[in-house]
Amino acid sequence: MKNIIKHDAYDKKAYERFLKNSKYLQKLISYYSQYHPIHEKLAEDTFYAFFKYVVEFNEYVEEKFKINKAILEGAIKNIEYEKSKLLTELDEVNAGTATIMFCEKFFENLKLAKLNKELKKFASEGKGEGLEDKLKEIAKNTMKDIAEEVSEVIQGFNAVENFGKGEGDKKLLSPEDRIKLADKILQNKKIREIVKKLGKLRLLAINEYKSKIKHYSGEIYSTKIGRDLKHLLPKEIVNLSDEILYYDFLRRFVDKKLLIYDIQNKLEKQKGPIIILLDHSGSMYGDREIWGKAVALSIIEIAKRENRDIYYIAFDDGVRFEKKINPKTITFDEIIEIASLYFGGGTNFIMPLNRAMSIIKEHETFKNADILLITDGYAEVNDVFLKEFDKFKNEYNAKLISVFVETFPTETLKAISDEVIKVYDLADEEARKIYKSIS
């Protein structure tokens, strides 16, 4: 027996399907062969450790594969593994994701500990004094290192899966497509970081949207008939205490003929679309870029719930990329495309703002738009443009919200902004300021 973890045909099929569709795992297995000649079975057993509901070790294992048992014993005998397994058991994509992340970190730690040669020697000659204990410790520390990130990546992956789904839309990706999507996210470190951040910010955006709904009471302005029990008139409530009238109440409830308040709710009024201008200049590279893209993508969730279109513009010293987005039909490829792009030039505010103006003028549906500018840059805006943009805003009822990331706002941009948001650090809560301003 080469596998150290007991598994059945269903488990084997799940692993083989993940391996077949994950080019990244195939690449990792090929690469790790230089460190651990029995790496392929280690990856397979790691998958079973995350996937199976009950994990048991095989009693009889070929001698040279017993080293994998030491590694996985170290990995699974800790609370971090148990927490991760809650997210991965019986889900082949999540289990495969955790497998990739464990293997990446384990072999990185193995290299740092300079145990590669010892492991190779053990695999070929069966010699390696104290090696099992060292590997157990490395595996244990690896699990501690990745546990939080596994949770963040899976949460982010779920966020990406849920984009483009309207209310009540239960269409699911096939297992093969889910694996390929996870593959795209995992093999690009920057996209992985953006998706991790997106998972948190999407939940924050949803909570902010729901908070506005929850705390808005509306204004009573008439009565009507229906069956909304939250808005019953007092005289209808009294009927519930009378045995005879109670049955009349039920009949009228079924017929939607109860007397209720009619609520004038401002939230029901159609809001304008959102034009996002995201700075892609050289100074945004790194954490600011990741935060900015995650914020931009998380706004799609608010737009979807409020039935608002989005127009996305990436700029540096010019407009480099633009795309009109329907939040209810956005594809995974579009999300990956937005997350992947980066340009790295200088900073110019006039060109993206001019493009935003053109979009609003060209598209009737983009009147009353919120223009959201996210930047860490400094670029002056001339007086001629200031007057032109101010006039434009009044004519088309547009609103400019300028977000300055870890920098001070320029005076000229402040002059034409309806709202200025200063982000002093890249904490998740800072994004809440933006969600409040657009929702």
From Swiss-Prot:
Coiled coil: none annotated. It comes from the Archaea. Residues 273-439 form the VWFA domain. GO terms for cellular component: cytosol. InterPro entries: VWF_A, vWFA_dom_sf. It holds the Pfam family VWA_2. CDD domains: VWA_YIEM_type. PROSITE patterns: VWFA. PANTHER family: PROTEIN VIAA. This is Uncharacterized protein MJ0811. It comes from Methanocaldococcus jannaschii (strain ATCC 43067 / DSM 2661 / JAL-1 / JCM 10045 / NBRC 100440) (Methanococcus jannaschii).
